[in-house]
A protein has these predicted regions:
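Short amphipathic alpha helix immediately N-terminal
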Residues: 88-102
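N-terminal interaction/assembly modules
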Residues: 1-84, 133
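DNA-recognition helix of helix-turn-helix
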Residues: 114-134
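N-terminal positioning helix adjacent to the helix-turn-helix/winged-helix DNA-binding module
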Residues: 77-80, 84, 88-92, 123
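Short alpha-helical "recognition helix" segments of helix-turn-helix
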Residues: 108-113
Length: 134
């Protein structure tokens, strides 16, 4: 059983997952950059510098784990929704995917499906009823 609220949540979480992915990439870059050698000469590391770099790397790794945990939760919800949506008719699946997964507006969904705006909402209500029963 999938509710409208879960679908809305999925739409929001999908955007959050994209943002988290970008943050993970940034963190991975910070984990690489501190250990780079200076171009002007030999690397000069004092014990204080080494401790600071180690602290930055440890914090970055902690944040990376937090982000991956969040992405894992998002993927669990996505799997649950995908299983339920798979039981819908093709045009219903398309409507759900365009609006909730691709993040299109209702107007854009109507254009993509070559439906009237009102017709997309009728079909959406049918989808929600079927998903609630599933």
């Amino acid at each position: 059983m999938i509710t409208k609220n879960e679908l809305r949540l999925y739409r929001q979480l999908k955007q959050e997952a994209k943002e988290l992915s970008e943050q993970i990439e940034e963190l991975e870059m910070t984990m690489i950059v501190p250990g780079c050698q200076q171009i002007t000469g030999m690397p000069v590391y004092h014990s204080e510098d080494h401790d600071k770099i180690a602290n930055v790397l440890a914090k970055a790794e902690q944040m990376r784990k937090v982000y991956f945990d969040k992405v894992d939760v998002l993927l669990d919800l996505q799997e649950k929704i995908e299983v339920a949506v798979a039981k819908l008719e093709p045009k219903e699946r398309r409507l759900i995917r365009l609006y909730y997964f691709a993040g299109l507006t209702w107007e854009e969904v109507a254009v993509q499906m070559d439906y009237a705006w009102r017709q997309t909402h009728r079909l959406h209500n049918i989808c929600l009823k079927k998903l609630k029963m599933a």
